[in-house]
Amino acid sequence: SPTTIVAKAPIEGIEYPVVGILDTGIADNPYLSAWKTADSFTSYPDQYKDPSHGSFVSGIIEYGDELNGLSTTMLPGVHLFDAAVYPDSSKQTIYVDDLVEHIREAVERNRHIKVWNLSLGTSIESSLDDFSDFGMALDNIQDENNVLIIKSAGNCTNFTRQLPKSRIAQSADSVRSVVVGSLAHAKGPYDYAEVDAPSPFTRIGPGPGSIVKPDVVFYGGNAGMNAGKLEKTGI
């Protein structure tokens, strides 16, 4: 049965860390509004934004333990800095170079925020020999601004066609970023992964030059196929 989540809010007198959310924007809803910082950054006017993905990511950051039914964090919550660097793709085309510059501008203007989450990237597999321009740009942004980017390893759908997993996506080959892969924390009747094994959709290493990527893993759900239909657990 679906998990019922109770909206929470910051408690007066407690100091919470701030995480910058480099994404599509964060919606004003009862679960997230109280955690959003008063200031924000955007590369696009509201009519060219769709905050669905950014809100989904923010919800996992803010309510991860509650959604997973686990207790893995010491933090009761974090403030969310909304950095909308990616548009509604049905209304506006964006290229990697544009995205990099939006990320750079958001970070440079807000250097007081030291931890940033980036769950956007490309679907292009990284090279075994050469680092991508995207990955190197993320390294440069972190070096110049003394910040840390938490980066998703990337997802792939190869499991739906019984194909091997893709390796990490370009941008997840950033050396400086902490790249996060996904583990299954539960197993439904049609799911492919065993509990505590890599999620069927998560990408794997190594990175260029045999560097270890992803750096860490965390629970992100499970999936499988049933008569040609995608089945998901905990996503």
Regions found by a protein language model. Name each.
Residues L22-G25, A84-Y86, L118-T122, S152-N155, ...:
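Active-site-proximal beta-strand/loop segments in catalytic clefts of secreted hydrolases
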